[in-house]
Amino acid sequence: MAGMVLGVGAGVFLLALIWVLVLLLCVLLSRASGIARFSIVFVFLGALIITTVLLLFPRASEFPAPEGEMKIVDAFFIGRYVLLAFLSAVFLGGLFLLLTHHLLEPIYAKPLRSC
């Protein structure tokens, strides 16, 4: 089943996004004055209508079709190792620069005062 994250489809995330945006808009409109404050009711009713439409008219069937055996292929195998080699070289270069500029920094003796 394509498009599933954490065992739920895209519709659940769409509904969550709609309600988060509606609640944010309601909070912002509650600070308004005049007739704009009463538009909260229309925003809430609009989100309620969209939610009922999405719940009552689903796109997919309730029972998914059985899938065939899936063969897992790593198409980015070489690229992943090139990226790993590059990041390892950058890490070792940064470690070398840290060693030369910070840990091996010379400490000069302060001159003694002569009387």
From Swiss-Prot:
GO cellular component annotations of the record: cilium; membrane
Keywords: Cell projection, Membrane, Transmembrane, Transmembrane helix
Compartments where located: Membrane; Cell projection, Cilium
Keyword Transmembrane helix annotated: yes
Description of the deletion phenotype: Diffuse renal cyst development with tubulointerstitial nephropathy and disruption of tubular basement membranes in essentially normal-sized kidneys. Retinal lesions characterized by slow-onset loss of photoreceptors.
Secreted is among the record's keywords: no
Residues spanning the membrane: 5-25, 38-58, 81-101
Bilayer topology term: Multi-pass membrane protein
InterPro entries the record matches: Tmem218
Family that this chain belongs to: Belongs to the TMEM218 family.
Record's function text: May be involved in ciliary biogenesis or function.
Summary of subunit composition and partner proteins: Interacts with TMEM67.
Protein name: Transmembrane protein 218
Organism in which the protein naturally occurs: Mus musculus
